[in-house]
């Protein structure tokens, strides 16, 4: 049913943040990738350079949707989900990033993991010391590590 929604109309933009979709977020991302024309699952505009969701109480599923937006919206350089802003541009282009003691949470770690798994990501050193990424965030980072 959800799959049919993406393919039946020329939909290019949808905002699914703050819905209790849980693990279905990954299915939505896969459907959007297959569709090929979806530019946002979170309402981020194609020319947007910064996004602040720090007051939106986003969950892990929201971070999965945002990770899709970051991959398809290249101009986005800064994203704030919690206390600290994530340097998206730096995470995409730098070889070393220090994010120690930033009070990062699981949602931040999911975004970081998504950027780590990008094909051309040059990141070789990432410092996440003294944060609050939790088990879910640690699992996302572990899944993004090179095999």
Predicted regions: what is each one?
Residues 1-147:
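Leucine-rich tandem repeat or coiled-coil scaffolds
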């Amino acid at each position: 049913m959800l799959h049919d929604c993406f393919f039946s109309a020329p939909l290019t933009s949808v905002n699914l943040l703050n819905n209790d979709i849980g693990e279905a977020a990954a299915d939505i991302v896969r459907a959007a990738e297959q569709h090929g024309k979806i530019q946002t699952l979170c309402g981020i505009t194609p020319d947007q350079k910064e996004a602040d969701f720090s007051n939106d109480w986003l969950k892990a599923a929201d971070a999965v949707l945002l990770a899709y937006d970051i991959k398809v919206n290249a101009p986005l350089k800064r994203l704030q989900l919690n206390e600290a802003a994530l340097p998206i541009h730096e995470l995409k282009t730098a070889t070393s990033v220090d994010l120690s003691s930033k009070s990062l949470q699981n949602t931040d770690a999911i975004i970081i993991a998504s950027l780590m798994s990008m094909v051309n990501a040059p990141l070789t050193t990432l410092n996440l010391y003294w944060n609050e990424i939790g088990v879910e965030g640690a699992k996302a980072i572990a899944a993004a590590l090179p095999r």
